[in-house]
Amino acid sequence: MKAIYSQPFMQTERRIEEETQKTIETVGYIHLYNDRIETPSNVFVIGDVFDVTSRSLSAGYCFLYLHTIIGVRTFVIKSSPDRFIFHYRSLK
Protein backbone atom coordinates (compact mmCIF):
# COMPACT_ATOMS: atom_id res chain seq x y z
CA MET A 1 0.00 0.00 0.00
CA LYS A 2 1.31 3.43 -0.93
CA ALA A 3 1.61 6.13 1.73
CA ILE A 4 -0.82 9.05 1.53
CA TYR A 5 1.92 11.39 2.72
CA SER A 6 5.47 11.09 4.05
CA GLN A 7 6.81 13.73 6.42
CA PRO A 8 10.61 14.00 6.72
CA PHE A 9 12.08 14.68 10.16
CA MET A 10 15.57 15.17 11.57
CA GLN A 11 17.34 12.63 13.74
CA THR A 12 20.34 14.10 15.56
CA GLU A 13 23.16 12.09 17.08
CA ARG A 14 26.12 13.55 18.94
CA ARG A 15 29.40 11.67 19.13
CA ILE A 16 32.74 12.37 20.68
CA GLU A 17 35.60 11.21 18.50
CA GLU A 18 39.21 12.02 19.29
CA GLU A 19 38.18 14.65 21.85
CA THR A 20 35.96 16.42 19.32
CA GLN A 21 32.18 16.53 19.49
CA LYS A 22 30.48 15.81 16.18
CA THR A 23 26.80 16.26 15.40
CA ILE A 24 25.37 13.93 12.79
CA GLU A 25 21.95 14.69 11.30
CA THR A 26 20.05 12.06 9.35
CA VAL A 27 16.60 12.19 7.80
CA GLY A 28 13.83 9.84 8.88
CA TYR A 29 10.26 9.66 7.61
CA ILE A 30 6.81 9.47 9.17
CA HIS A 31 4.52 7.67 6.72
CA LEU A 32 0.77 8.23 6.80
CA TYR A 33 -1.43 5.44 5.42
CA ASN A 34 -5.22 5.03 5.41
CA ASP A 35 -5.08 2.78 8.47
CA ARG A 36 -1.82 3.62 10.27
CA ILE A 37 1.11 5.97 10.86
CA GLU A 38 4.59 4.44 10.63
CA THR A 39 7.72 5.90 12.19
CA PRO A 40 11.16 4.26 12.18
CA SER A 41 10.51 2.87 15.67
CA ASN A 42 6.70 2.49 15.91
CA VAL A 43 3.55 1.69 13.96
CA PHE A 44 0.35 3.31 15.21
CA VAL A 45 -3.12 2.28 14.07
CA ILE A 46 -5.06 5.44 13.17
CA GLY A 47 -7.49 4.76 16.04
CA ASP A 48 -4.55 4.85 18.49
CA VAL A 49 -3.54 8.37 17.39
CA PHE A 50 -5.66 11.01 19.11
CA ASP A 51 -4.25 14.06 17.32
CA VAL A 52 -1.29 15.47 15.40
CA THR A 53 -0.13 18.98 16.27
CA SER A 54 2.90 21.18 15.68
CA ARG A 55 4.76 24.10 17.18
CA SER A 56 7.10 26.40 15.28
CA LEU A 57 10.58 27.09 16.57
CA SER A 58 13.23 29.56 15.52
CA ALA A 59 15.59 28.96 12.60
CA GLY A 60 12.91 27.29 10.47
CA TYR A 61 12.50 24.22 12.66
CA CYS A 62 9.24 22.86 14.01
CA PHE A 63 8.14 20.20 16.49
CA LEU A 64 5.60 17.69 15.22
CA TYR A 65 3.68 15.92 17.99
CA LEU A 66 1.89 12.59 17.59
CA HIS A 67 -0.57 12.27 20.48
CA THR A 68 -0.97 8.50 20.82
CA ILE A 69 -2.43 5.93 23.16
CA ILE A 70 1.09 5.31 24.57
CA GLY A 71 2.03 8.97 24.96
CA VAL A 72 3.20 11.91 22.89
CA ARG A 73 5.92 11.28 20.31
CA THR A 74 7.93 14.36 19.29
CA PHE A 75 9.76 14.87 16.00
CA VAL A 76 11.93 17.79 14.84
CA ILE A 77 11.15 18.83 11.29
CA LYS A 78 12.49 21.46 8.90
CA SER A 79 9.55 21.61 6.48
CA SER A 80 5.98 22.65 7.20
CA PRO A 81 3.86 19.86 8.70
CA ASP A 82 0.61 21.42 7.50
CA ARG A 83 0.01 18.94 4.66
CA PHE A 84 0.73 15.95 6.92
CA ILE A 85 -1.68 17.29 9.56
CA PHE A 86 -4.32 18.06 6.91
CA HIS A 87 -4.17 14.53 5.48
CA TYR A 88 -4.25 12.96 8.95
CA ARG A 89 -7.30 14.99 10.01
CA SER A 90 -9.10 14.15 6.76
CA LEU A 91 -8.87 10.47 7.80
CA LYS A 92 -10.48 11.10 11.19
Question: What is the role of each PLM region?
Answer:
Residues 22-59:
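Phosphoinositide-binding peripheral membrane targeting modules
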Residues 3, 8-34:
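N-terminal first-folded block
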Residues 2-11, 44, 50-92:
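Acidic, Ser/Thr- and proline-rich intrinsically disordered linker/docking segments
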